[in-house]
């Protein structure tokens, strides 16, 4: 089945900005996260698709390659790879090294290929508080670890491990036809360069077995959804004692019930009473460090923004903290008593008349506009 266009997966058009890509990824990853759609295979596949798209479009170099060549840029070792299928693949450096080595003196001659293990991915969901302040999380991964029975050699204890007679230990078979030389993986030893007399029964000669492994991951302060933490050597081990790949921990920050995050800034809505909005006063607003007092000037309207500097998220690069931006929402009183309603009626009456433009300029302007509209409408009918 043909792969979907990565831009379409994220609901974007080609040429979308870096921020657009990040916002789309955060929104879709949160919507289709397996924890929110337990048991849904469709959501799980969609989540993988979204992450694969962001893995490419969220990286400038990979995105440039994708824009030019499409999915072909990442097939057969084209560069992007994928978490689910491993980050490995053919290495262009090795490929060209073999070609030019053959032409200019056989640089790759007799060299044994050591193929390291696959890179792994782990999706980790954390709270906003943990993302802002940093934390340590214990995780469990499914991986390929060294076989305890054979110590990773792939051979039964006491069994001989000899040099492969077909490739003489290089792990590669070379064939020459006229001026052309081709090289391929040795079919006898599968590239290991060794022949095992009796393969280990526990790992069937691979030198590695499936295991669950517990790890402790340190999350630095300031991480955001889509950030990746690389744990070198914590991926799957390679066959027959080859080194391990890396583990990539991909961060997903859970939605917060009060704050919204945009980069290093935090946003929240702060409701205030009708009286405080009109007369002014002092209120308490929440921050991730605790409650902070905020002075509200008289005649504050809904939508007014107050910036609290340094109360946002510290950048992982610069270390400087962003701001907390509070948006005021004037709350209309409800469940009023008869006495309270009477007081509001009196207030309304006192604000009407000639002084309306002074006390309620927007209402006055709106009413004047409505009057002019109907006056003009009446003239056009005549």
UniProtKB/Swiss-Prot annotation:
Its main location: cytoplasm. Binds 2 Zn(2+) ions per monomer. It is found in: Cytoplasm. A zinc finger (CR-type) spans 134-212. Participates actively in the response to hyperosmotic and heat shock by preventing the aggregation of stress-denatured proteins and by disaggregating proteins, also in an autonomous, DnaK-independent fashion. Unfolded proteins bind initially to DnaJ; upon interaction with the DnaJ-bound protein, DnaK hydrolyzes its bound ATP, resulting in the formation of a stable complex. GrpE releases ADP from DnaK; ATP binding to DnaK triggers the release of the substrate protein, thus completing the reaction cycle. Homodimer. This is Chaperone protein DnaJ. It comes from Haemophilus influenzae (strain PittGG). The gene is dnaJ.
């Amino acid at each position: 089945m043909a792969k979907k266009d990565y831009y379409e997966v994220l609901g974007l058009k080609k040429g979308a900005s870096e921020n657009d890509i990040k916002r789309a990824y955060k929104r879709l990853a949160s919507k289709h996260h397996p924890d929110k759609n337990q048991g849904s295979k469709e959501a799980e596949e969609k989540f993988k698709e979204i992450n694969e798209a962001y893995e490419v479009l969220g990286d400038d170099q990979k995105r440039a390659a994708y824009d030019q060549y499409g999915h072909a840029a990442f097939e057969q070792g084209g560069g992007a790879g994928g978490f689910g299928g491993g980050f490995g693949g053919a290495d262009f450096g090795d490929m060209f090294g073999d070609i030019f080595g053959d032409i200019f003196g056989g640089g790759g001659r007799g060299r044994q290929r050591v193929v390291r293990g696959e890179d792994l991915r782990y999706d980790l969901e954390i709270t906003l508080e943990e993302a802002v302040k940093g934390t340590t999380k214990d995780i469990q991964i499914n991986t390929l670890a060294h076989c305890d029975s054979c110590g990773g050699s792939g051979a039964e204890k006491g069994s001989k491990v000899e040099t492969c007679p077909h490739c003489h230990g290089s792990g590669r078979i070379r064939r020459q036809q006229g001026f052309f030389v081709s090289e391929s993986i040795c079919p006898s030893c599968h590239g290991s360069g060794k022949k095992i007399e009796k393969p280990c029964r526990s790992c069937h000669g691979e030198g590695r077995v499936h295991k669950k492994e517990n790890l402790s991951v340190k999350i630095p302060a300031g991480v955001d959804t889509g950030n990746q933490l690389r744990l070198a050597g914590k991926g799957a081990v390679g066959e027959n004692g080859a080194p391990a790949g890396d583990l990539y921990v991909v961060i997903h920050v859970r939605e917060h019930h009060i704050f919204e995050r945009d980069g290093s800034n935090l946003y929240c809505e702060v409701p205030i009473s009708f009286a405080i909005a009109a007369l002014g006063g002092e209120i308490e607003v929440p921050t991730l460090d605790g409650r902070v007092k905020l002075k509200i000037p008289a005649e504050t309207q809904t939508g007014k923004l107050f910036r609290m500097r340094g109360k946002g998220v510290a950048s992982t690069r610069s270390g400087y903290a962003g701001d907390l931006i509070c948006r005021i929402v004037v709350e209309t009183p409800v469940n009023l008593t008869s006495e309270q309603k009477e007081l509001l009626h009196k207030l309304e009456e006192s604000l009407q008349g000639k002084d309306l433009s002074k006390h309620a300029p927007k209402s006055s302007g709106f009413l004047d506009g409505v009057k002019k509209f109907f006056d003009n409408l009446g003239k056009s009918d005549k």
